[in-house]
Amino acid sequence: MSLRNERLNQILTEARPKIARHWSLYDGGFGHGGTAAAVAGVDELLVGYFGKLKDMPDGTPATTILHEIEMLLRGLAEVNASCGGAYLETDERDLLVPIIIEAATVAGLDANEFKDADPTLQFRAKLLIL
């Protein structure tokens, strides 16, 4: 396994318990009116995102990595909509966005090329999520 993929595995392995702890702070462990399906959906989307990044060869164009960020955020927007639009908010942004950016950076994206070093911002604004 490449060092890049080892690092991606490490990021996800460290993030998942933090995310689970976050959900446990809210009603029934689901938070903001979420459901078990919503919690599982967020986890599934993150695992899929990391899998896509790990499958990319070294030197993958930034546009390809950005596409995966956009697809992840679209999926998160769908999960959020399924919970009345109030499931993924500021606290969740503060939790999830750094993980998304760190993984994209490990995959080869230069986050410093984006406003506030946040390549997710353009998609989050468009999708009105996080």
Predicted regions and their residues:
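Short secondary-structure junctions and interdomain/linker hinges
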Residues: 26, 56, 60, 79, ...
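Charged, amphipathic alpha-helical oligomerization/scaffolding segments
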Residues: 41-48, 68-71, 75-78, 95, ...
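Generic alpha-helix signal with a bias toward terminal, lower-confidence helices
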Residues: 24, 57-58, 77, 88, ...
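Residue-level recognition of alpha-helical structural elements
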Residues: 38, 61-65, 85-92
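Short terminal alpha-helical segments
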Residues: 1-55, 127-128
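Mature extracytoplasmic domains of secretory-pathway proteins
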Residues: 53-80
